[in-house]
Amino acid sequence: MPSSLGQPDGGGGGGGGGGGVGAAGEDPGPGPAPPPEGAQEAAPAPRPPPEPDDAAAALRLALDQLSALGLGGAGDTDEEGAAGDGAAAAGGADGGAAPEPVPPDGPEAGAPPTLAPAVAPGSLPLLDPNASPPPPPPPRPSPPDVFAGFAPHPAALGPPTLLADQMSVIGSRKKSVNMTECVPVPSSEHVAEIVGRQGCKIKALRAKTNTYIKTPVRGEEPVFIVTGRKEDVEMAKREILSAAEHFSIIRATRSKAGGLPGAAQGPPNLPGQTTIQVRVPYRVVGLVVGPKGATIKRIQQRTHTYIVTPGRDKEPVFAVTGMPENVDRAREEIEAHITLRTGAFTDAGPDSDFHANGTDVCLDLLGAAASLWAKTPNQGRRPPTATAGLRGDTALGAPSAPEAFYAGSRGGPSVPDPGPASPYSGSGNGGFAFGAEGPGAPVGTAAPDDCDFGFDFDFLALDLTVPAAATIWAPFERAAPLPAFSGCSTVNGAPGPPAAGARRSSGAGTPRHSPTLPEPGGLRLELPLSRRGAPDPVGALSWRPPQGPVSFPGGAAFSTATSLPSSPAAAACAPLDSGASENSRKPPSASSAPALARECVVCAEGEVMAALVPCGHNLFCMDCAVRICGKSEPECPACRTPATQAIHIFS
C-alpha cells in the first residue's frame, strides 16, 4: 500500500472532503459509485475535529462526579457509548485500514464515518428512530457505597414479627375493655348500702377493680352496670353480690330482733320480767337515742334491759323490758341523761316520769355519773330490792345490779346500808343521817309529815351510787361527824316544821343532799361553780362580784362566784335538815324564817329569790345574797356555813 506521504495533499484531501460533503449534501442516488481507492486510504488522514474529544471529556468528568454520589448508574451507558464512539474515531484516524463501513441503510448510506462522533454524543442517537442502537457496554464494577455506615431504612426490612404480636395483644385488650355486664341486687336498700354515704363505697370499688360501675338511679331497677376488662368485671361482680348478701343477712337479723337498729337481740321473755313505758318530750327523743343509737345502747348494756325506741310518727314513749329493778334503773338513767344534757327536768304532769324541782346539785361535779336522781316508786309498782343501797363501790359506766335509791324517802321504808364501805351509811366513818344525833343513830321509818317541802309530786332523793373518790362531797369527809344544819328551813317559800327537836327524836335515816363542811382550819378547798342549765343573761350585771378565792381566819379558802341560771327549772340546792348537836350555832333570825316566807331574812324588804351554795338556804333576795358572797368571809346567816356562790331561783 502506498504510504500517506506519496498521496497528494491538496487534491486527495480536497476531493475526499468534497466528496464527503457532497455526499452529505446531495440526495443519495439509487446506486452510488464507491469512492476510489485513493480516497479510502486518504480519508482517515486528516485530524478529527476537537469537539467530540472535549465533549466526551466533559461528559466523563460529570459522570465520575455522579458516580461518586451513587447516582451514576444511569449515566454509565452514555459514558460507555461516548467512549466507544471516541475510540472508533481514533482508530479510524490512526489506522490506515479502517473497518469496512456498515452497509448503507437509508439516507445516511453515503455519510463518512468521521461524522459519527459529532452526530451521536451520549444518548443522542437514541432520538433517531431509524438509527440502530449502539452495542451494550461491557459491565463495570459498581462504585463504592458511601452510605454503608448508615442504618438501613425500616422499609428495607421485612415485616417484623414483634410488631405483629403487640398488635394482636392490643387487639385482644381492646375487645376485653369493651365488656359490660349488669349486676342486679335485691332492692334499693341494697343499692344504698353498696354505694355508701356520698358514694364512698362504690368509689373504692371502682378503684379496686379498675372498672366503671354505673349505679342505678332512684326509681329505676336496682341493677349495677359494670364496664371493664373481663377479669375486672368478674371481680367487681363478686364484690357487689357479696356486699348485697351481707346486707341481706344483717337486715334479716334486724327483723328477727324486732326491727330495732339499736338492739342486738330480741325482747327478752324470761319469767319475772316486766315492761314499763318511759315518756319523754318530743324534743329529747333524739338526745336519748344518741348518735347512731349509742346512748340508748349504753343504757341497755348498763341496766341489762331491752329498750324499744319510739318511731318518728308515734308517741315519744320508750318501752323498757327487764327485771323490775333493772327497769327502774334504766328509767332513772334516761332521766339522768336528759338532766345532764338539758340542765333540768321537764315537767309533763304529776304522773309523768319527769319532775320539776328547785334543786341545784352541781351536776358538773359528778361528771359521767351513771344516775343522779331516783324517784319514789308509784304505789302500783313494787320498789326495787335493796342489794347494795347507797354503796360507793359501783364503777362508773360498768354494768352492775341496781341499788336501792329510795331509802328514807316519803312513803317508803328506810333501807339500812349493809356495806361498811359506804361513806354515807349511818354507822360508817364520815357518815351522817337525817334527824340523827350522831353516826350511830338508829334508822327507822320516816313520819308522813317529816321533811314536807310543799311539793305536789314525789320527793327526789340523790343517787349516790358512785365511788367514794368520785363523789362531790369527797373533799368534805372526815372521821367524825360535824354539825351542819339545824332546823327545817323553807323551800321556795313553803313553811316547814317549826321545831327541830322533834326531828332529832324521829330518828329517820336519809342521805344528805348537802355536805357537812369541816371547821375552817388548815384546809384549803377550791369548789367549782355549780352547773347552769343555760347561758346566764344576767351574768354581766354590774352588781355581780368578781370571782376569786376568799380566805378564812382559820386558813381555809373558798372560791366565790355567783351563778345565776336563767332556766326556770334550774334551782338552788334543797335545804335539808340534820341532827345537829346541841351546841349548833343557830342564829336568832332562823326561828323567824317560817313567818317571813317570801321576804328576805336579811333586809326583810326584798323578795326571796336567791340561795347560797353549798348550804342551799333559799332565804335571801338577790342583792343580799350577792352581798353575802362578796364579803371577805362569806357565810350563810342561817347556818354559819361558808358560802361559795349565790344562785338565782326562778319560781
Swiss-Prot record:
List the RING-type zinc finger ranges. 600-640
Which residue numbers delimit the KH domain?
Answer: 179-240, 273-334
Question: One Pfam family for this entry, by name?
Answer: zf-C3HC4_3
Q: Which is a GO BP term held by this UniProt record?
A: mRNA destabilization
Q: Which GO terms describe its molecular function?
A: mRNA 3'-UTR AU-rich region binding; RNA binding; zinc ion binding
* Region spans: Disordered: 1-159, 375-394, 401-443, 495-531
Domain of life, per UniProt, equals Eukaryota
Location in or out of the cell: Cytoplasm; Nucleus
Could you tell me which residues carry Phosphoserine? S514
Give the Gene3D superfamilies listed for this entry: K Homology domain, type 1, Zinc/RING finger domain, C3HC4 (zinc finger)
User: Where is composition skewed (Pro residues) in this entry?
Assistant: 131-144
- Biased composition range(s): Low complexity: 55-69, 85-99, 434-443, 499-509, 519-531
Phosphothreonine: which positions carry it?
Answer: T510
Posttranslational modification:
Phosphorylated.
Keyword annotations from UniProtKB, A to Z: Cytoplasm, Metal-binding, Nucleus, Phosphoprotein, Repeat, RNA-binding, Zinc, Zinc-finger
Q: Which InterPro entries match?
A: KH-I_MEX3_rpt1 (IPR047228), KH-I_MEX3_rpt2 (IPR047226), KH_dom (IPR004087), KH_dom_type_1 (IPR004088), KH_dom_type_1_sf (IPR036612), MEX3 (IPR047227), Znf_RING (IPR001841), Znf_RING/FYVE/PHD (IPR013083)
GO annotations of cellular component type: nucleus; perinuclear region of cytoplasm
List where Gly residues composition bias occurs: 8-23
Tissue specificity as recorded in UniProt: Ubiquitously expressed in all the cell lines and tissues tested.
Function noted in UniProt: RNA binding protein, may be involved in post-transcriptional regulatory mechanisms.
Let me see what the UniProt entry remarks about domains. Binds RNA through its KH domains.
Q: What is this protein called?
A: RNA-binding protein MEX3D
